[in-house]
């Protein structure tokens, strides 16, 4: 957060808006408490530095998964307890409002098995699209992509310079293992590491060196946080792994093994943070679904427009398409 407080490599005057996505989980709730406390301390100084504007986006948990509680009462609590931040709550299906042309992208991604009826409400359209994906891993992967695109598009709509993510060391380790397994290894330089993302926004992970147990100890000191946080349910051993996505499997693995070997999980995230973006030729093409650059391993020149399909999908998104996953 020093980067934003001291305006390193950022405009020296005017507002410096940043976005914090809040899931009501332990990590993002603790991060909000910490960052808001920093804003409060800056404002108490006789001549405070410009600092930054804190915007918080909550994507309704129940719109991501029906098994998640709606937690509606928490939104009012947040506004009362963190007055120096602005809060917005959106359902996941509002991604249609923020990402232009998404209906055509989803229709081509799924293929003829899915027909997008634009006359239906956005929620029903998204439900129909998600129902057309039968693989647990593919469904979780696409949900994650749509969630990221909504958050990034919302940040851009506010003119934010960066996004601060509330991922703990455990979460980043699980995300690293899952993304490599899904073919999204090239995205680790911005999905897990601090720095500039392919979307022109600075991504920061201030909690990258803290374990979940440490964050829980912090939250226990502040009762107001306990009224906001949705606790994670206990991991059940009596469950079929074939019904779990790769993301869920890796999170379960890190949660169980991280308690025994915390140093190993720390090494995973620290090593990934040293990676640099690929210098492979991209031709400037972006994946239609996840909006990241598509690498051109053969170093070919850009194809003529008439030779290109309507939309391009990266390797990972191609793998998760129905019929291939």
UniProtKB/Swiss-Prot annotation:
Its main location: cytoplasm. Pfam families: CTU2 (PF10288). The keyword Cytoplasm applies. Keywords: Cytoplasm, tRNA processing. GO terms for biological process: protein urmylation; tRNA wobble position uridine thiolation. Pathway: tRNA modification; 5-methoxycarbonylmethyl-2-thiouridine-tRNA biosynthesis. It comes from Emericella nidulans (strain FGSC A4 / ATCC 38163 / CBS 112.46 / NRRL 194 / M139) (Aspergillus nidulans). GO terms for molecular function: nucleotidyltransferase activity; sulfurtransferase activity; tRNA binding. Plays a central role in 2-thiolation of mcm(5)S(2)U at tRNA wobble positions of tRNA(Lys), tRNA(Glu) and tRNA(Gln). May act by forming a heterodimer with ncs6 that ligates sulfur from thiocarboxylated urm1 onto the uridine of tRNAs at wobble position. Prior mcm(5) tRNA modification by the elongator complex is required for 2-thiolation. May also be involved in protein urmylation. It is found in: Cytoplasm. Belongs to the CTU2/NCS2 family. This is Cytoplasmic tRNA 2-thiolation protein 2.
């Amino acid at each position: 957060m020093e980067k934003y407080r001291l305006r390193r490599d950022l405009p020296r005057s005017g507002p410096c808006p940043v976005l914090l996505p809040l899931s009501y989980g332990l990590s993002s709730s603790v991060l909000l408490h910490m960052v808001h406390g920093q804003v409060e301390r800056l404002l108490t100084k006789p001549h405070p530095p410009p600092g930054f504007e804190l915007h918080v986006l909550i994507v309704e948990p129940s719109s991501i998964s029906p098994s998640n509680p709606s937690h509606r009462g928490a939104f009012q609590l947040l506004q009362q307890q963190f007055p120096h931040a602005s809060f917005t709550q959106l359902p996941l299906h509002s991604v249609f409002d923020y990402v232009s042309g998404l209906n055509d992208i989803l229709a081509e991604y799924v293929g003829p098995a899915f027909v997008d009826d634009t006359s239906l409400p956005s929620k029903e359209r998204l439900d129909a699209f998600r129902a057309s994906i039968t693989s647990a891993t593919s469904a979780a992967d696409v949900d994650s992509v749509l969630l990221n695109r909504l958050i990034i598009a919302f940040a851009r709509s506010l003119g934010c310079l960066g996004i601060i993510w509330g991922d703990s060391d455990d979460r980043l380790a699980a995300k690293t293992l899952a993304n490599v397994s899904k073919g999204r290894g090239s995205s680790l330089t911005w999905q897990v590491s601090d720095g500039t993302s392919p979307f022109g926004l600075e991504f920061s992970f201030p909690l990258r060196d803290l374990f979940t147990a440490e964050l829980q100890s912090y939250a226990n000191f502040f009762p107001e946080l306990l009224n906001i946080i949705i606790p994670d349910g206990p991991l059940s051993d009596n469950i079929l792994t074939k019904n779990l996505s790769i993301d869920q499997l890796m999170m379960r693995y890190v949660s169980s093994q991280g308690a025994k070997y915390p140093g190993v999980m720390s090494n995973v995230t620290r090593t990934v943070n040293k990676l640099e973006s690929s210098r492979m030729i991209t031709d400037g093409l972006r994946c239609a679904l996840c909006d990241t650059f598509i690498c051109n391993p053969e170093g070919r020149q850009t194809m003529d427009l008439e030779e290109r399909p309507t939309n391009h999908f990266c390797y990972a998104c191609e793998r998760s398409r129905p019929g291939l996953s």
